[in-house]
Amino acid sequence: MRGELKWAASLVAVAVVSTTGPAWAEAGAAEDIVVTAARTALPANALPLTVDVVGKRALDQQIAISGSVTDAVATLTPSFSPTRQKLTGAGETLRGRSPLYAINGIPQSTPLRDGSRDGFTIDGFFVDRVELIYGSNALQGIGGTGGIVNQVTVGAPEKEGVSGRVLLQGSADNSFHDDGLGGKVGGLVQYKAGDFDATIGATFEKRGVFYDGQDRRVGLNLTQGETQDSRTTNFFARLGYAITPTGRLDLIASRFEMKGDGDYVAVPGIRRPWRSPLQDMPTSAIRGNPPGQPAASRTESIALSYTDSDLWGGNFVSQIFFNRSRDTFGGEIATQATFQDPAIAPVNTLFDQSQNRSRKLGAKFSYERTILNALTATIGFDALADKTEQALIATNRAWVPPSDFRSLAPFAQANLKLFDGMVRLAGGARWENVRIRIPDYRTLASTTFVACTTPPTATPCGAASYGGVAVAGGAPKFDDLLLNGGIVFEPWDGIRAYASYAEGFTVPDIGRITRAFSRPGIDIDSNLEIAPVISNNREIGVEIKRGPLDASATYFWSSSKNGQLLIANALGVFDVQRQKVAIEGLELSLRAQLPIQGLRAGIGYAHLKGRFDSNNDGVVDSDLDGANISPDRLNLSLSYDRGPLSAIIQHQIYFSRRFDGLARAADDANPLHPQRLSNNDFGGYALTDASIRYDTGFGGVSLSVQNLFDKFYIDYSSDTRLPADNFAIFAGRGRTFTLGWDYRF
């Protein structure tokens, strides 16, 4: 990686020099940004939070490079895990915990049975900006233990008459293989007449197969699903009416579906032995017909909102919504041990695949008012009902029984401005009242399977041990008061320091827990494993936004006494373990306008360290692995935006990581390394992307290149998870070109 580090050092030097140049003469006040995900009309600089907003221009640029909102956010955010470039985003975390994905504040995550498809629920063509709130918080309810990724859809048209946007894109791998070609078309039409407005749009995208930096097809994960070799459609509509000069009614609906074409099957790779001089051979793909239905994800949502920015002198926001998702997991060619049941078919002959089905009905209300131009107070109430199940669709069995989740949550926030805004004190509380209802059910037959040995060590064993266990259902209730508080000190405009404490609330992946029970006599009402995860986040930060300079530094530490980890079992299926978790990290960011007008340099860095209690003695003693935390990262960028021309070149360095702990120490002490834990270490890699766009007057023409230098690498997830699975050694995507044309009218 020496060459990449030299390249990085040179760009760092450019950025540092730029901060001392004549561009300082252009210093001015930073624009106030309101983050709707924070549930307040106050600007972001009034809140003791670390927030980022990815605007439409930057978002479109990143999507042109990588293809999705999730990839765009992960690329721009150093403390976000590198994406797996798959449909399922299991193990992709923000600050070492799962973020809450939302669209206009509507939660997309399904914590009862987390299928990790929440990053693909709307096409980026319809997203106006992405709001990121870092760290555990309960501002949007359950699920925000790692932060919030809120996708705000396109707004109402501002000018009378008809307007809109058209997008055409084509993509190709480095060698322009026929099966690697892809394309996208999108259209959006808006109409405004007086107080009424309407927006309607649709997109269609066909993705070809991916090729790695060695011109080999990237392997397929048939079960979890792929973005390659897929088709995506999204229909979007928005109707609005201004009831009063300050009051507005909006109805927003979306239907998103991504479905695999099912044209390929996986070819196993080769995981080299520990300390082998040979490079791992990644999983690949050949043409074939996998069994069952291809992996797919479908999300349908509709929301009705009423907002009034001057209702009795305050800001009123209300929303009711319905969200329904159906996530199909593909079938493997080899029969899966988990699905075997001799009562249905002989062992090792039974094929099956699963499907998550979830629907949510919810409402949100908040009212905010400023008193005496100093105290801004907010009161609100959220309600959510979620029903989720995971079915085996080939044999019509229940893997995860239909589970009902109900949450009622009143909350209050206050923000006090002192000394003419030099100091702000903020704080609040949210009371979460949760009920989880699960009916009586029986686990799959394979949960009680015991392999026969010679001599026998268990009776019964083999086929006679299949059968599963009966589990008594229940309706346990949980409630918790979640607190937050902080202080903001802004001695000069654009320079501020802050410190804060916040608590986040979520439920563990109950589906993974309930489907894994293997001993009789379990009662849901008394089972502690389904108790909520309460995490806290403490952080201190400094920000400077003056003139050409935009810099920040944040240190945070987070803990949960009974957190959740994803741990692979003997069959390679990830189960949930409830253990104490502690995470801390440092985030640095520097963006500066260079002396050349329109030219900017940027640097971002994140260092994260996470530990968990592996032996339940109350002390964190082992590192979180790649399924639960991201690697340290350095982001570098150089961008130009002036007149009709805009361009960017960006470089991401993912640093190597060794995972230590009690199990690793025991393995290192054994010269045979029976656990091969070193195979879970991360070797690191560096990637470069570029994009250029020119506005011709009749639309903009863009050319984007992902992985500019065609780097071959094994992705972070594959390098650190399932070291013994030769079907899970996935290489990252090689050099990929995307040519686009977009036109606004």
Go through the PLM ranges and name each one.
Residues L168, S305-A334, T338, E490, ...:
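Membrane-embedded beta-barrel scaffold of Gram-negative outer-membrane proteins
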Residues I106-S136, G187:
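Short acidic/polar hinge/loop motifs at secondary-structure boundaries
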Residues I122-L167, R744:
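A beta-strand signature from Gram-negative outer-membrane beta-barrel systems
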Residues E226-S230, T246-S309, S325-T335, Q340-A343, ...:
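Flexible loop and strand-edge segments within Gram-negative outer membrane beta-barrel domains
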Residues H177-G208, D212, R216-D263, R298-D310, ...:
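Transmembrane beta-barrel wall of Gram-negative outer-membrane proteins
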Residues F505, I653-A669, R693-F745:
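C-terminal beta-signal and adjacent terminal beta-strands/loops
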Residues L167, A377, L418, M422-L425, ...:
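Gram-negative outer-membrane beta-barrel transporters
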Residues T36, T70-T110, Y134:
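Extracytoplasmic beta-strand/coil segments of soluble accessory domains associated
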